Amino acid sequence: ATYLPPEQLISMVAEFAEAYKNDRPTLYTQARDLQNNRKEHARQSVAGDELEESMVDRVSRIVVGSYDAVNGGFGSEPKFPNASVIRFINHRYRTTGEDFFAAMLIKTLDGMSDGQVLDNSDGGFFRHCAQADWTQPQHEKMLEDNLGLAREFLNAAILLDRPQYRETAKQTIDYLMSQLYDPDTSGFRGSQGAHSEYFSMSPDRRSKAAPPAPDPSCYANSNGLAVTVLLDTAWKLGDASLQTTALQILDRLDSMAQADTFSHVYSEDGPSDVPAFFTDWAWLLAALMQAHGNTASESYLERAVAVAQIMVDRFFDQKGGGFFDIEDQPEGIGHLQIREKVLAENTVAAQAFVRLHQSTRNEDYRQIAEATLIAFVETFREQGEFAADYGLAVHLLKNDMVEVTVEGRLEDAGCQELIAAAARLPQPNLDIKTVMAAEGDTVARAHVCLDTVCLPPVDDPAELAEAVAGLTKQQESPFQDIFQVFPGN
């Protein structure tokens, strides 16, 4: 079950107790069968055929097949606001310019904004709706969902020139900062409780009532995601406080990693005894690479290299490719004996290793990313539309990275316009970095590089796309002098 009200949970526990008392052998047989099935499924994630860019189109067909053309969104009831699928559609619209993807985005984001899945009073998105038309919400608010949706609403606002999506993104970030962020812990709580009575109140009544309490714990993987989202949105929204918060969270996560106390769960009392899982390390690596891209600090890159080595040593399958979800536990009980490869967290790692390869020029990192994605060639279709991030990761790996570094002041409108222009570029593997301009330098500039070839800086957003198009075309004819094509400013 996705969610059980207290009375249903109590009833289910009573049924379990009765079955254990009266039919224990059957329960043991079922448990053994389940464990054997999981072991068999885990063996399927091994190196498959060669990775092909055509897989991006296959994922596109899967995602489009799940699209709800009546209500927007993907899948049937219960309807989840799946940020990873929206991210993939944003990516496909940016890289193809096809109106069909734009229509899917608008139908989906408008449906969510106008429906009951968005809390228009306090801000933030609920976990899901019981009905396909975005009604009858289940009132829990999840950190990961809201982070991903804030990022994708903001990206869609830029791609589609729809300022209302930007406002929704900002309101969602404001909700997270006011309701889930704990400055004493330097982390976001995992969720806000599903208090249907409170969320059914009018805004006036809510203002006089206590909001539902948040989860008392912070989780390393979702806070790694928070770092990447806040760093990205800080520059797009022109809000320096978001970058400050992101780096404080990253410092907390990485300090635990360096002290060998990195835990999946932490609170103001410190890290718990629950060890970090692979997903936590994957998101830490992604956060370090995002911080390196947004600050140009080499210390984050150095730490990323160290974290990548830990991930390979503890979790990587040297024979079949891909990363296991937990460390090897020969003495583990039950399902803890089974090391599985989870597609979602492996795609996070693959994308981070692609960025690490670009920053270090160490070919080993690219090979690890490729081996990770190849491990799911035979099984990604089983995930349905949830394979969206896999399609995105394949698209990144199979294309050369175009790196756009925007140099400016975070709060400057001209800098934000350049970043928006960069975010509209159609190149599949696009890495937008930022550098704070020197004091007194009031002109924002974009520096564009493809592999080892870089252009003179561009300060006009309208010229950025033309410059990048010229550079990618120039790479097809490497004997021409690029400084004759792009004489600079």
Where are the regions that the model predicts?
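TPR-repeat structural position
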Residues: 102, 166, 243, 301, ...
